[in-house]
Amino acid sequence: MFSPQIEWDCSQCQSGPTDRRKYCTNCHSMLSWTCTGAGKSGLHTHYYRHRDSCSYCTPELEEERQQKIEEKEVALQQHFQALNDEQRPWSEWKRTDASCIQHTGHDVEQIQELYSMCEEALINYCSHKNYRHTNSAATSYLSPMNLLVVTLWHLKHYHSERYIASELDLSQSAVNYFLSAVVDILHSCVYPELMSFPAGMDNRRILHGPEEHHKLIVGSTFITIPQPDNLDQRKAYYHAKSSTNYTLKVQIACDFRHRIIHVSECYHESVHDITVLRESGLLEHVNDSVQIIADKGCIGEEYVVIPRKKPHGRELTDEDNDFNRDINSARAAIENINQRLKTYAILGGVYRGAVEDFHKVAKSFRSFVLSVI
């Protein structure tokens, strides 16, 4: 059976065959087909495989095909759900909130909420990627839930890939691959859900700082890295207060509910704070009613509020001192967030990944922040 959606031709002699033989009657080359509905084409030998899966060529079979797809998806979800419940480490950690928090930084309910945000992407990854590199037949691959919790475990404690591989009886290459993949999934599925500007920021009833138009707070933190080999890189990454003297800079913004709403890209430590702020896109959202509280490094923008400097040769007035006290008190929110981030091993220690790929480091950092907020 040939569909009216199919056009036949001979690619060698450009003839338009009138019958449906496999080979051209003029030059004996194999005929080619083009499906005008699906926009696909191929040789005669592949036609029937296309026809059996094409809704344009066999619309009468589309309902049956759709039913089979749905049945397969349900069976797959049931399989992964059973695997989620039976496979360690989730089968062990989910027993108590204390165990779950100890390993991932989240309680059971929070883990399940995160999982619901990226369930489809995790299942698709498990379904389409053959990452089953293991050291024994005991564990063939990790379930979607275990991919998530093991990645959160890694982000919280920053265990080495070798250690995770030995704990889960997986190959190190498999651990490396799925950690990178799940960080991407977290970044694409969860980050946009949790990182967003408060609705109606210019509303007076929205929680604000010392003045009603103070709506956001920004502050920079750093990711400690090993000493670079290159002298120019050492100058660019130098930061005297870190354990290695070299860091990457990241800027974080929060609202007055202490909710993180933005994490910037990564920058050399030598890049000025105001440059990071200008490139973050945050300034596109400020106006008379929505202003940002920052530190003294962010001078030069109309709607960015910073502590007042002491005039040359004079002291600050009482009004200036009161203003600075209020601003510094408000900025304590972002400082507390940065301090809380530092209690996690991935920030409290030295970053082990490649620092040259700033975007990849930023994705890892943002995914890590998701495990804290």
Predicted regions and their residues:
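Cys/His-coordinated zinc-binding microdomains
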Residues: 14, 28, 36-39, 58-61
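Short, well-ordered secondary-structure "scaffold" segments embedded in the functional core
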Residues: 147, 157-373
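N-terminal positioning helix adjacent to the helix-turn-helix/winged-helix DNA-binding module
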Residues: 114, 145-146
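Short, flexible, mixed-charge glycine/proline-rich loop motifs
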Residues: 1-5, 14-18, 25-30, 45-49
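Short helix-to-turn junction characteristic of helix-turn-helix DNA-binding domains
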Residues: 153-154
